Amino acid sequence: EIFLVTKVQPSDFAYKRTLSAVRESFRKLDAGYIDLLLMHWPNPDIPVAETLTALNELQAEGLIRHIGVSNFSPALVQESMRHATIFSNQVEYHPYKNQAALIEQAKAEDYLFVAYSPLAEGAVRNDATLKSIGAAHGKSAAQVTLRWILQQGLSAIPKAGSNEHR
C-alpha cells in the first residue's frame, strides 16, 4: 500500500495559489486523492490561516485526506492547529539535532512527528559511538539510529544513500 505525500511550496501559500498548486499536483499525480499534503517551510509573509483555509477546502472536496506541516516551530504548529487538524510535522531530526520541544508537543497534541534526514546525511555511519553500539548488537550505526528514533514513538523517512535510488 502506498501513502501518497506531497508538499505545497511557501511561494504558493496565498489562498488562490494554494488551491491552484494543489489541484495541479493532484492532476499530475493522477491519483484518487493525496493522503497527506504538507505545507513545506513557514512563509512569514502569508498567514498560516490563509493557506489552511484553502487546504481545508481541498480536504472537504476529497482531494486530500490529511493536512500536515514541515519545518514548523512549536508556536507555528500551535497556531496552525487553531485553523486545521494537523496530522504531522516533518522536521530534520537525528542524534545531532535536538528537537525535544517539538517531540514533546507532538506527543501532547497527538500529531505525528516525522524525522527527515534521520541519518544526518550519512554522518551517523562514521560515528564511533553509534558504530560501537551497533557492533555489540550485530547492527550498523544507521540501524541503531533508526531504532533509536522508532523507540521514541516517532516516524523516520531516511533518504536513499545511492544516487540511483534517489
Label every model-predicted segment.
Residues 14-19, 48-50:
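Short, conserved acidic/polar surface loops in the N-terminal third of protein domains
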Residues 1-12, 33-42, 71:
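A short, structured active-site edge motif that brings together acidic residues
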Residues 12-14, 97:
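Residue-level signal for secondary-structure boundary sites
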Residues 18-38, 57-61, 111:
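CE4/NodB-like, metal-dependent polysaccharide N-deacetylase domain
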Residues 1, 31-34, 64, 86:
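Local beta-strand N-terminus motif with an aromatic residue
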Residues 42-166:
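Beta/alpha (TIM)-barrel catalytic core signal, keyed to glycine-rich beta->alpha loops juxtaposed to Asp/Glu
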